[in-house]
Each structure stands twice: as structure tokens, then as C-alpha cells.
């Protein structure tokens, strides 16, 4: 091949000797040149046609090498002409030629003439290269230019500029050689933000990059760096807040020149989240940290250190370290965060201590030093035994800095809890010294002089064998010697003995035959708070081990109340999670169950029901799954345990947070059976109600009409297989539409009341006619016989006023589990009986019998009977009768009302502050004993039966507390049926006080007002009554101002129907301001301080958000008006809203409005419509200035030049940034049905792109279907604008944005829909978008191999400057 090529080309360039001698005087005529060219090409064409395809590239490379081997510029120019002609006549492919030229090693800037000629040739033929080839050539040309040094002779610059001309041509928007989007990507890879382009290219590159700033802005959320989340404990993944774990930057898509603040590390956001209690899961979520993979995260480490420094600064300004003050809460939280992140190796302890030393040096901050050492002691004492001593020695550097005293520090007052902090440094020294001794290390440090008195005090206390519980000496010793087993045994032994009780003392527990160890006073919280994590772990480990040991031993003596209460208190500490709640669920419960220690099992379930706070959702669902498997075991088929298992399961189900339901249940999609009950219809119904509420509140089903393909489908299908049932139409009408459709399709035939009546009569006849006692017992208790026995007992009492002994025996034989089915049938039977009773005397008789069955004979407990009644699916009149029975059961006799009023009067819900709970508990049970084994019936039969039921220990529960989750359900059922509103008000009047003991009263109100918004719209009185009943039950146990605003309490609570209170703008501003101040961490904050570990909400912002939403939903004002008033807080000029803080207010409005039902937030769509229809955007006349500048809210706001449309844009972004994906999924419909018909001008189109562009990334991650619909809508709007506009001024930014969508999001998924649209656009637009469709025939002729394509319409988008830095380099690898 090479020989043939050589002969072809050497022939052409061969010259005579005389020509060479007189080189400057000989000149070929143009005809000779042409002849030479033609003959050379002819010979080459013949050769090329015989050459196999695979040798083509090699051949072209040889030719380039041959040309570059020539020294005569004339020869080179001639050969280049040959190449150009070969390309023009389609003999050689231009891409191959260009690539061979640019990649030649001989192409060096020093050979200036070769350089100039080569780039002129490339410039001439590059028009024929396909767009991906042009991209590769651009990259190669830019790389070649980088080889030119910064200093060259000015004489050669002219020749070097040929390369610049090639780049200029490639970047020419009108030539359209490739999507400009490709070009900017290559440029930004080479010159990231802040890097200067090569001098040869000058402003060419920077101007081109600047032309992409509008595209970057279209994809940016206004004020994104100021938006903050509310941290919850749901475990839901939230894509809006993800950050890069190495740089803390937002994960921005595409190599666009975003504004500088978007490229900055988002330390403010991470710091804010870290400051919130219970935020560690969210931090892991944001940074993508996985507990399984130990990976150090330096940026997280820095923020933790900064937080400690901030806490030190706070301590300087606080007068005293008061109990429960903000400073104490902050230090408490810090130690919890530090332990978690260091334990899982996301942060390195020695690095953090050294960094702290560096940041505190020279600051003179020493007021908080004890608290800092307390935080460090937590980690040191727990991990020093497993790690090298060297890891902990940097603490001594910190000591030298913070404890400059030359004299001894005096011993603090050890009657105060903060004394444990004052001793922290001494404890650290003791642990370090102990480690050094054990390791025989030479690093032993003598006790610093300033700590001598502290050390002596501890040594002396150790020698004192009787330690009192009245001061903090025990805590001090535990903290100092937890790594020294000889010394630790004494103080820990005292704590343990206090709660275990000494072996001899016994006390009785509620019920018969139930005895427990005698210790009743738990360890107080401030003592537990004063123990280091290591000491707490030893204590909880000791308790758990003892419980397991007692379970194995099948001890008949129940656990001491003090032990149970102390164990519950220890489970609140997140820092001991592995031994705490994790051990409780995955080790203790299974062990106890395996040992068949039913008393201890009952105790653990009671603890979970009445004493646990902020348990992560996956643990709760794991327990629920345990309970369902427990329910199937024969041994749990006893009245008390069965009742406890069902009650606990009911609490777990109804307490699931709306944002917790989907993430938790999707974990069980492969086996939904494990989280569902195989036999309890009530529990499965409760789960469906929870599911309906959760999907409504999170707007999961918004915009869809079927559950097909969702995580709910298998769950619902399995429930219907286990416990087929129907729903009453008034309940069903509140379900989200897809759930309604499912139950209408899966309708279950109901047994008619006539049949039920007939069957009861039939069975009753048998009862009366059978004589053999054994036959009767066998027949009525047999498995599979109709569950009608309670109906028969009812008839016996109605006809004979008594039940005989056989009745009792049958009940015993039926067993707790099977009896539930009898209660269910009985509930239906009662409704039919009451419906047909003649009223008056007979009705009173019916009520009396029913009450006797509950309170006199103890046949069924009130909470179970009411739950069954509330969960039946009666319609119309029968539903009213059912609710009437519930009301009578609860209010008619005094039995239950007295129990409630006494319990509410005598007890307080703050169990963690009490030392005498057990005494009050016993007093109550003595007055109102629980009878769970038909005791009343046993006494009444003739002859009476002597029962010796063995009760399981009851430490916390009673009928009132068990009734609370049932009451939640009852209220909801009553709300659904309009005619029973008055009855509900009566119930709330008499029993509302119970909400004092509800563990989530505000959340319950929030869920209720949200879920029933449609039902309560016009029932403002009932709404107010509900809020009033629940809030006033809590007034004695909450600080004033903890929930509802003063204005609302004054005007909203006492409003009359004829004089409805309509709040003014000031009211809404103050309400939003309260949330803004809370999130800003203002001190003192708008809400009273509290211990968040025992609060309903995990942190102040979550509390503020929920109480704000409850108050707004409780107003007697339509949702639409409230929504508009909230938007007006920033859209109208409000004196209470500070200009400089406007994005924080928008953030708060976004949080509040998205947490409200649809009518409240959908008004934003109306505002957007009015802006898009406004003259400014629709007139089409040129604006003063440049639209991209006007839509840059932050810059305009700072320069006081913002307009209404930019305010609405920024607010819409804040709202949508906080929206759930369900709420966002209405955007495609909004675009296609509402905005598309209005958008006619370029400004309107750009406004819509700005509005929706930033959310495509979220749609891609969470609802791809919506992203594709939006992509198509964008093209349809462009088509309308193209048809309505004579001139398009911003074609380039529009096309850049559409390319961004293609390469970052949609790929070719919408190609078929948009091809048709692109074909219909004006030629200039078609030319620019031709690479999206790949339709060559629509190109306005192949781009000529000459100067520039002649496109008449130019794009005049010069761009304002703004700064930015390279985003995540996402390769353009979407299928093209």
C-alpha cells in the first residue's frame, strides 16, 4: 500500500533540477496545477477503490504523514488542495481527514506555516463532519492549542490564529456544526469555573460560556442556598437535599456555568441539619453515607467541629448553665451526634480534637470547657479500650489550652447535676492513665496540678462503701471508673440494686396472683443524664441480661416496677441504640418469646405502648411483624396477652407517620404477609385507614386513578385474601380515588341481617333444647361453628336475666383469639337489634344488658367492643344506630366516665419526671380493677365459680389508655357521617380530657384536619370544637404559647357562627414569622424550651411547622383564602417581613403551604397563570433590559429592581422545592391544560422554562413519566410561540435548554413526539434543533465547505456575567 501511495504522490510533487535551482522564478499556471491535481486524484481514486475498508484510516494517516514530511510550503499547500478536492468530491470522508491532520505528531506550533495551512484545510472541510465528529475535533483542537506556550514571538501570532478561526467556526451558532451544548461541555471540562482559557482564544471562549448562563439559570432554583428542610424522623429519602459527600456541593446536572453560590460548599445547610435533634439519619441520607461502609467524611467532621465551637461561644454569653436551657440541650445533642458519627467512622476523633484545638486557640473561650470535656469523655470512656492510646492523647493538648489555671480547681457542689461536667476532664485523665497502665505504655501522664482536688475527691469517695442516692457521687464514680472493673463494681452495684430491689421485698401488681420485686422508684432522668454513655451502656446491658436470665428461669416473680421504668428511660438515648432499642427488638423480645416468659413479654409490649419515644420507623414495623407472628402461637391465646398484643399492634399501625408508610411497607413487597394480620379484620382495617391517610397527606396518588403498579397493590390484595371486608360509603368517599376504585372492584358480599337473625334464633333454639352439658360446650365452642355465642348470651340476658354455668364454660373454651370473631358478629347483631327495638323501655333494657356484659359480667372489654363497632361497615340509618350504641356505651352508664375523669384528674403524662407513677397506678387499679377473665360472670352464675386466674404484670396500662387509639378511630368515623356531628361534640366534652395522655396529640389533629378537609370545610364549629377539646386537655401540662398563637386563642377559639373571625395580613405574617424565627435558631425562641427526647416532635422546627398547620386548618376560612393569604405574606409589601431575609420567609411559606391540603397550595397555580397572562410577559414588546436578568430574583432583589413576576417565580420554586413528588406530579397537567393555551410569546415561554426547569432532575429520579410529559409540553409550547412570533430573539438559550433536557434527562424517549414539532418550526430553529431529530432531509442543505452557513436570523442573546464553578461532570452518554 505504502509503495503505491508513494508513487502516486511523489509523481505529483516531483520537480526538475532546474525548477529547484530557480525555485522562486518558476510558477505553474493554474491550468498546470489543475491538470496535476486531476491526474493525482484520478490515480488515487483508482487505488482507493481497490483498498479494503479497514485500511482506509491507515491510508489517510500515511498521506498526512507524507504531507507533513514535506518542507516546502508550496508542496504542502498543493497536497492539501488535493486532500480538499478529495473530500469535496466525496472521495475521502472529512472526519477521517480532519482527525488524521489534528492527531499528527508533526503538527506543532513551531512549524507555523504547516500549522496555518493545516487549520485552514480543517476550517475548509469540517462542515462535512457529523456533529459527534465535530465535538471530538473541538476537543482535539483545544488540546493542541494548549501546547502553545504563554510567550511566543509576535511574528508568528498571525499564523497561529488559524487554529482560533477553526474554534470560532465550530462555536458559530449560525453554522450549527454541532449542538452548542456539546461544545460548552468540552470547554468546561478543559477550563472549569475560575480557570482562564488559552490566550490565543481570548474572549471567544468566555463569551461562548457566558451565552450558557441563561440555560444554567433556567435550571436553577431561585435562592436555593437559603432553602432549609424541616428534619423529621420518617426515614424517607429526600432527593431535594442531597449533597456531594466530598465537596458538600449540590449535585448539579450538566457542565453549565451555574451561579457561583450553587458551586459553593453548602456548609450552612449541613450545619443547620446537624444542629437539629434526631437528624442523624437525614445527614446520612444527604451525604449518601452508609453505616455498613465505614468511610471518613472530612466535610462532616469540619461541621461537627464548627458546631462545638459555636456551642462554646453560646456558653460564653449564657449567664448560667440552667437545667433544660438552650445551651444544655445543645451540648446534650452534640454529644449524641459526635458519638454516632465517630462510632460509625464517618468522623475521626483525633482529627476532630486537633481541629478543635486549632480553632479554639487564642479565642479565650473557657466558660463551656467543662461541657466540651463532657462531650469528649462520652466517646473516650466508651472506646478507649478498643483503640490505641495515641488516638486520645490530643485531648491533653486541648486541656492545656482550656485549663490554664496554675492553682487547683475547687470541687463543685455535687448536689447539682452539672457537677458531673466539672469532673469530666479529671475522668478523662483517669481513663487515659488506666489505658497507659494496661498497655504498659511510656505515655503515662502525671495528674495535672489543677485537677488534684478533683482526683483526691474521687479517690476518697471510692473508699466510702455506702454511697447515697441523694447526690451525684455515684454518677461521678461510674463516669471515672467505667473502664476499671475493680472500682466500677461498687457504684454500678448501688444503681443496679436500687432498681432491682433486694430479694426479700415483694409487692402486688394489678390483677390476681401477681407479685413483683419490691423496688418501685426508678432512677431519675437527671441522674441517667449525668452518666456517661459507657456507664449507661453497662447499666442497660446489666438490665437486659437480667431480664433474659429471669425469662429463662421462668421466675413467677415479676420484674420490679423501678427496673421496668428505668429500662424504658434508658431506651430514649439514641447514643446507646445498639444495646438499647435495637437490642430490645432483635434480641430481648425473641429471647423472651423463646422462653415462653409471657409475663415479661407482656411487660415489654406495655413499655413499647406507653413509654417509648422517637423509635425509628423500621424498628416499629419490625415489632409489628413480630406481633403478627406472635398472634398465631397457641400459647398467646389467653385473654390478657391477646388483648395486649392486639392493642400494641393497633397503636403501632395508627401511629405510623404519613411519610413513614411508603418507605417502610415497600421493604416488605416480596412478602407483605409479615406485616399484615392473618385473622384480625380490625387491625387490617386500621392499616388500610392509615394507608388512606398517609397517601392522602403525602399526595401519593395525586393525578392517578388506579393502584395498579404501586406498592399498595400487593398489600391490599393480601389483606383482602386474609380478611375480606367492605367499607361503608361514607368512609370510602374519604379514601383517595385509586383506593376507592380498588374496594369497589373487590366488593365482598355481606351477610344479610335477616340471615344473621335467623341463624341466632336457630342456635338459640339448639341451646335451649340440648341437655347434655358436654355436648353443649362442644357444640358452641367447636372450631368452625358460627361465631354467634355472644348473641346467644345477649338473648339469655334479655329473656332470663342470667347466664348459667355452661355459658361461662363455653366462653372459656372458645378462647381469646376465636372470641374476636364472636365480638364482630355481636357488633352487627346489636345494630340490627337496636334498629328494630321499639324504643322507650325496651331500648333502656337493651342498653342495660349491653353495659352489664361489659362492666358487670366482664364478657368483653369496652375498648375491643367499641373498636369492633367502629370498624363495621353499616350504611345510612344503621350506621347512625351503630354510632348511637357507641355513644351510649361510652356515656350512658357512669362506669367509663368515672374511670376517665379520675384517671385524668389524678395523673400527669410526663412519666419521665415522675418518681411515684407506680403508687398512683396501683391506687387507680385498686379502685377500678381490670377483669379480663369473665370474673363478673363467674361470680354471677349459680353456683359461683371460684376463679384463680394468673394475671400477667401490668405496669402502665388501663382501660383509659387502651381506649385512646380506639377513640382516635371513633372520632374519625363520627366525622365521616354528618348526622352524628352533635354526638361527637358530646363525646369530646365528656372524654376529650383523655387526650392529655395522647403521645401525639398535635399530629393526630394535623392528620385529622388534613384528611377530612373536604368534610370539615363547612363545619367550622365542629373543627373548632375538636381543636379546643384536644388542646384544652393539655393546657395544665404545657407552658403557655407552646402551640396555638395568642391571636387565635383570643379571636379564633371563641368565634360565633354569626360573627366569623377573618384574620388580617398581620396575623399570617406573625404566624409565618414564628416559624422563620424557630428555624433561624433565634434565642429565646418563639416556643418554650423542652426536652425533645420526650416531645411529640423531634425538634423545634418540626413542632413549629405542625402547630402552624393545625392552626391554619382550624381557621373558619376557606383553604383557598388561607393559601392566598400565605402567598401574600411575601407577594404583597408587608411591614413585618424584612427585605434582607426574604428567602427565609419564602422557605417557611413553602414548608407550610406544602404541608396543607391541596386547596391551600393549588392557589399558587392561579398566581402563576395571572403572571404569565400579565402584560409584561404577554405583550411581546421588548422589555427594559434582558429577561434572564429580570428573572434572576436574587440579583434583582439585592439591587431593588425586582418585579412581581420574579417574586412569584422565587416563591413557586420555594414551594415546589418542598413539595412531595405527588404534589409535583400535577405540574405536567398544569402545563398542558392550563399554561399551554396561554403561552404565545417568547417571554412567556422562558418564564415557564424557568419555573419548571429546575425540577426535571427530581422528576427523573422519582416520576419519570411526568418528566417525559413535561419534555413534550415544552416543545408544544415552543411550537405555539414560533407560530405567533415574527422574530425570535432568544433562540439559542431556548435550544440550549432543550439540548440540556435531552442529554441530561430524556435521551431519545420523546424523540417520536417532538420530531413532528421540530419539523414544523422556522428554518433557523430547525437548523439548531436538527441534532435532536437526526433527520438529515430537514437540514437546509448540507453545510457548505466554505466560510459559513448563510442563516439569516441570528441569535442576539448576549448574557450578563455571573460567576460559577464546574458542576458534577456528567458524561453525555444518554443514547443519542
Curated annotation (Swiss-Prot):
GO terms for biological process: circulatory system development; negative regulation of neurogenesis; pigmentation; positive regulation of gene expression; regulation of transcription by RNA polymerase II. Keywords: Activator, Nucleus, Transcription, Transcription regulation. GO terms for cellular component: mediator complex; transcription regulator complex. Pfam families: Med23. InterPro entries: Mediator_Med23 (IPR021629). It is found in: Nucleus. Residues 1346-1369 have a biased composition (Low complexity). Residues 1346-1376 are annotated as: Disordered. The keyword Transcription applies. Its main location: nucleus. Component of the Mediator complex, a coactivator involved in the regulated transcription of nearly all RNA polymerase II-dependent genes. Mediator functions as a bridge to convey information from gene-specific regulatory proteins to the basal RNA polymerase II transcription machinery. Mediator is recruited to promoters by direct interactions with regulatory proteins and serves as a scaffold for the assembly of a functional preinitiation complex with RNA polymerase II and the general transcription factors. Belongs to the Mediator complex subunit 23 family. Component of the Mediator complex. This is Mediator of RNA polymerase II transcription subunit 23.
Amino acid at each position: 500500500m505504502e509503495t503505491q501511495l508513494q508513487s502516486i504522490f511523489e509523481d505529483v510533487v516531483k520537480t526538475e533540477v532546474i525548477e529547484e535551482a530557480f525555485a522562486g522564478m518558476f510558477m505553474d499556471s493554474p491550468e498546470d496545477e489543475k491538470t496535476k491535481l486531476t491526474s493525482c486524484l484520478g490515480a488515487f481514486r483508482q487505488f482507493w477503490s481497490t483498498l479494503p475498508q479497514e485500511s482506509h484510516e491507515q491510508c489517510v494517516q500515511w498521506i498526512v504523514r507524507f504531507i507533513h514530511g514535506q518542507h516546502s510550503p508550496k508542496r504542502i499547500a498543493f497536497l492539501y488542495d488535493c486532500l480538499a478536492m478529495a473530500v469535496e468530491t466525496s472521495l475521502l470522508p472529512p472526519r477521517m481527514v480532519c482527525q488524521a491532520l489534528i492527531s499528527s505528531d508533526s503538527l506543532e506550533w513551531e512549524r507555523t506555516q504547516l500549522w496555518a495551512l493545516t487549520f485552514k484545510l480543517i476550517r475548509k472541510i469540517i462542515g462535512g463532519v457529523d456533529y459527534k465528529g465535530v465535538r471530538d475535533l473541538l476537543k482535539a483542537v483545544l488540546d493542541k492549542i494548549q501546547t502553545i506556550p504563554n510567550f511566543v514571538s509576535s511574528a508568528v501570532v498571525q499564523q497561529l490564529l488559524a487554529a482560533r478561526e477553526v474554534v470560532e467556526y465550530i462555536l458559530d451558532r449560525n453554522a450549527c456544526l454541532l449542538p452548542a451544548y456539546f461544545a460548552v461541555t468540552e470547554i468546561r471540562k478543559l477550563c472549569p469555573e475560575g480557570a482562564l482559557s488559552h490566550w490565543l482564544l481570548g474572549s471567544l471562549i468566555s463569551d461562548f460560556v457566558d451565552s450558557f448562563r441563561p440555560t444554567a439559570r433556567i435550571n436553577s432554583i431561585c435562592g436555593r442556598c437559603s432553602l432549609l428542610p424541616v428534619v423529621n424522623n420518617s426515614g424517607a429519602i429526600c432527593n431535594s437535599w442531597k449533597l456531594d459527600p466530598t465537596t458538600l456541593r449540590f449535585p448539579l446536572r450538566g457542565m453549565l456555568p451555574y451561579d457561583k453560590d450553587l458551586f459553593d460548599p453548602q456548609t450552612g445547610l449541613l450545619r443547620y441539619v446537624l444542629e437539629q435533634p434526631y437528624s442523624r439519619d437525614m445527614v446520612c441520607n444527604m451525604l449518601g453515607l452508609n453505616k455498613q461502609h465505614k468511610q471518613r467524611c472530612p466535610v462532616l467532621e469540619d461541621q461537627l467541629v464548627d458546631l462545638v465551637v459555636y456551642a462554646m461561644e453560646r456558653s460564653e454569653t449564657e449567664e448560667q448553665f440552667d437545667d433544660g436551657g438552650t445551651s444544655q440541650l445543645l451540648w446534650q445533642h452534640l454529644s449524641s451526634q459526635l458519638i454516632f458519627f465517630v462510632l460509625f467512622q464517618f468522623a475521626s476523633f483525633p482529627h476532630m480534637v486537633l481541629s478543635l484545638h486549632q480553632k479554639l486557640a487564642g479565642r479565650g473561650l473557657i466558660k463551656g470547657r467543662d461541657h466540651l470535656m463532657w462531650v469528649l469523655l462520652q466517646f473516650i470512656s466508651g472506646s478507649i479500650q478498643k483503640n490505641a492510646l495515641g488516638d486520645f492523647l490530643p485531648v491533653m493538648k486541648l486541656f492545656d489550652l482550656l485549663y490554664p489555671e496554675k492553682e487547683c480547681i475547687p470541687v463543685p457542689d455535687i448536689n447539682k447535676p452539672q457537677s458531673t461536667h466539672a469532673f469530666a476532664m479529671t475522668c478523662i485523665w483517669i481513663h487515659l492513665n488506666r489505658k497507659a497502665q494496661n498497655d504498659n505504655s511510656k505515655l503515662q501522664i502525671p495528674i495535672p496540678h489543677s485537677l488534684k482536688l478533683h482526683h483526691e475527691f474521687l479517690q476518697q469517695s471510692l473508699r466510702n462503701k455506702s454511697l447515697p442516692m441523694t447526690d451525684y457521687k455515684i454518677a461521678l464514680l461510674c463516669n471515672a471508673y467505667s473502664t476499671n472493673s475493680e472500682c466500677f463494681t461498687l457504684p454500678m452495684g448501688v444503681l443496679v440494686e436500687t432498681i432491682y430491689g433486694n430479694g426479700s421485698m415483694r409487692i402486688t401488681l394489678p390483677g390476681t396472683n401477681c407479685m413483683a420485686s419490691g423496688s418501685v422508684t426508678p432512677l431519675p432522668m437527671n441522674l441517667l443524664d449525668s452518666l456517661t454513655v459507657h456507664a449507661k451502656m453497662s447499666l442497660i446491658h446489666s438490665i437486659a441480661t437480667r431480664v433474659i436470665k429471669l425469662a429463662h428461669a421462668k421466675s413467677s416473680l415479676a420484674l420490679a416496677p423501678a427496673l421496668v421504668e428505668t429500662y424504658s428511660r434508658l431506651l430514649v438515648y439514641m447514643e446507646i441504640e445498639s444495646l438499647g432499642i435495637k437490642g430490645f427488638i432483635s434480641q430481648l423480645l425473641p429471647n423472651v418469646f423463646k422462653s415462653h416468659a409471657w409475663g415479661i413479654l407482656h411487660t415489654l409490649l406495655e413499655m413499647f405502648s406507653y413509654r417509648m419515644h422517637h423509635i425509628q420507623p423500621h424498628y416499629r414495623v419490625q415489632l409489628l411483624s413480630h406481633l403478627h407472628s406472635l398472634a398465631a402461637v397457641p400459647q398467646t391465646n389467653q385473654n390478657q396477652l391477646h388483648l395486649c398484643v392486639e392493642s400494641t399492634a393497633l397503636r403501632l399501625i395508627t401511629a405510623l407517620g404519613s411519610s413513614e408508610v411508603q418507605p417502610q411497607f415497600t421493604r416488605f413487597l416480596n412478602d407483605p404477609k409479615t406485616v399484615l394480620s392473618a385473622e384480625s379484620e380490625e387491625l387490617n382495617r386500621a392499616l388500610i385507614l392509615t394507608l388512606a391517610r398517609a397517601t392522602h397527606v403525602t399526595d401519593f396518588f395525586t393525578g392517578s386513578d388506579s393502584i395498579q403498579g404501586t406498592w399498595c397493590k400487593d398489600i391490599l390484595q393480601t389483606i383482602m385474601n386474609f380478611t375480606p371486608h367492605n367499607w361503608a360509603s361514607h368512609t370510602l368517599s374519604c379514601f383517595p380515588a385509586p383506593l376507592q376504585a380498588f374496594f369497589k372492584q373487590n366488593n365482598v358480599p355481606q351477610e344479610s341481617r335477616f340471615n344473621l337473625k335467623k341463624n341466632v334464633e336457630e342456635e338459640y333454639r339448639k341451646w335451649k333444647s340440648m341437655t347434655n352439658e358436654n355436648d353443649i360446650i362442644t357444640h358452641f365452642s367447636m372450631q368452625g361453628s358460627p361465631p354467634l355465642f355472644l348473641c346467644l348470651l345477649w338473648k339469655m340476658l334479655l329473656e332470663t336475666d342470667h347466664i348459667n354455668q355452661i355459658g361461662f364454660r363455653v366462653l372459656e373454651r372458645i378462647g381469646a383469639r376465636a372470641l374476636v370473631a364472636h365480638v364482630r358478629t355481636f357488633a352487627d347483631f346489636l345494630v340490627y337489634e337496636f334498629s328494630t327495638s321499639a324504643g322507650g323501655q325496651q331500648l333502656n333494657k337493651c342498653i342495660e344488658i349491653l353495659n352489664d356484659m361489659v362492666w358487670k359480667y366482664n364478657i368483653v372489654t369496652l375498648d375491643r367492643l367499641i373498636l369492633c363497632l367502629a370498624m363495621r361497615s353499616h350504611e345510612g340509618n344503621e350506621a347512625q344506630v351503630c354510632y348511637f350504641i357507641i355513644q351510649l356505651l361510652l356515656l350512658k352508664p357512669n362506669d367509663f366516665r368515672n374511670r376517665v375523669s379520675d384517671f385524668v384528674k389524678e395523673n400527669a403524662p410526663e412519666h419521665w419526671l415522675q418518681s411515684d407513677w407506680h403508687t398512683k397506678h396501683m391506687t387507680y387499679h385498686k379502685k377500678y380493677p381490670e377483669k379480663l377473665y369473665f370474673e363478673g360472670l363467674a361470680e354471677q352464675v349459680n353456683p359461683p365459680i371460684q376463679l384463680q386466674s394468673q394475671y400477667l404484670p401490668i405496669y402502665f396500662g388501663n382501660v383509659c389508655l387502651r381506649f385512646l387509639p380506639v377513640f382516635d378511630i371513633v372520632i374519625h368515623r363520627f366525622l365521616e357521617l354528618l348526622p352524628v356531628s352533635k354526638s361527637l361534640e358530646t363525646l369530646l366534652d365528656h372524654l376529650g380530657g383523655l387526650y392529655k395522655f395522647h403521645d401525639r396529640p398535635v399530629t393526630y389533629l394535623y392528620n385529622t384536619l388534613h384528611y377530612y378537609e373536604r368534610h370539615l370545610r363547612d363545619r367550622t364549629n365542629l373543627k373548632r370544637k375538636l381543636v379546643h377539646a384536644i388542646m384544652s386537655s393539655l393546657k395544665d401540662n404545657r407552658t403557655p404559647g407552646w402551640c396555638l398563637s395568642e391571636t387565635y386563642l383570643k379571636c379564633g377559639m371563641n368565634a360565633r357562627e354569626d360573627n366569623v373571625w377573618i384574620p388580617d395580613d398581620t396575623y399570617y405574617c406573625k404566624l409565618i414569622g414564628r416559624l422563620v424565627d424557630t428555624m433561624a435558631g433565634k434565642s429565646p425562641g418563639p416556643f418554650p424550651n423542652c426536652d425533645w427526647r420526650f416531645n411529640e416532635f423531634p425538634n423545634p422546627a418540626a413542632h413549629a411547622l405542625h402547630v402552624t398547620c393545625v392552626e391554619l386548618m382550624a381557621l373558619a376560612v376557606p383553604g383557598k383564602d388561607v393559601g392566598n393569604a400565605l402567598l401574600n405574606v411575601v407577594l404583597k409589601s408587608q411591614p413585618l417581613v424584612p427585605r434582607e431575609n426574604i428567602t427565609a420567609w419564602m422557605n417557611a411559606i413553602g414548608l407550610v403551604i406544602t404541608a396543607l391540603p391541596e386547596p391551600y397550595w393549588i392557589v399558587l397555580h392561579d398566581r402563576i397563570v395571572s403572571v404569565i397572562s400579565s402584560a409584561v410577559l404577554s405583550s411581546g414588546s421588548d422589555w427594559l433590559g434582558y429577561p434572564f436578568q429580570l428573572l434572576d430574583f436574587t440579583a434583582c432583589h439585592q439591587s431593588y429592581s425586582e418585579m412581581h413576576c420574579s417574586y412569584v417565580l422565587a416563591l413557586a420554586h420555594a414551594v415546589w422545592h418542598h413539595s412531595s413528588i405527588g404534589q409535583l406530579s400535577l405540574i405536567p397537567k398544569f402545563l398542558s391544560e392550563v399554561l399551554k393555551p396561554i403561552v404565545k410569546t417568547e417571554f412567556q415561554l422562558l418564564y415557564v422554562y424557568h419555573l419548571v426547569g429546575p425540577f426535571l432532575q427530581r422528576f427523573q429520579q422519582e416520576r419519570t413519566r411526568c418528566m417525559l410529559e413535561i419534555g413534550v409540553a415544552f416543545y408544544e409550547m415552543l411550537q405555539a410561540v414560533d407560530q405567533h412570533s415574527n422574530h425570535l430573539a432568544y433562540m439559542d438559550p431556548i435550544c440550549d435548554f432543550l439540548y440540556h433536557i435531552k442529554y441530561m434527562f430524556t435521551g431519545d424517549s420523546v424523540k417520536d413526539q417532538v420530531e413532528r414539532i421540530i419539523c414544523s418550526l422556522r428554518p433557523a430553529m430547525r437548523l439548531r434543533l436538527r441534532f435532536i431529530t437526526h433527520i438529515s432531509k430537514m437540514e437546509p442543505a448540507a453545510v457548505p465547505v466554505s466560510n459559513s452557513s448563510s442563516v439569516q436570523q441570528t441569535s442576539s442573546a448576549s448574557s450578563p456575567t455571573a460567576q460559577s464553578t464546574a458542576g458534577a461532570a456528567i458524561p453525555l452518554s444518554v443514547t443519542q
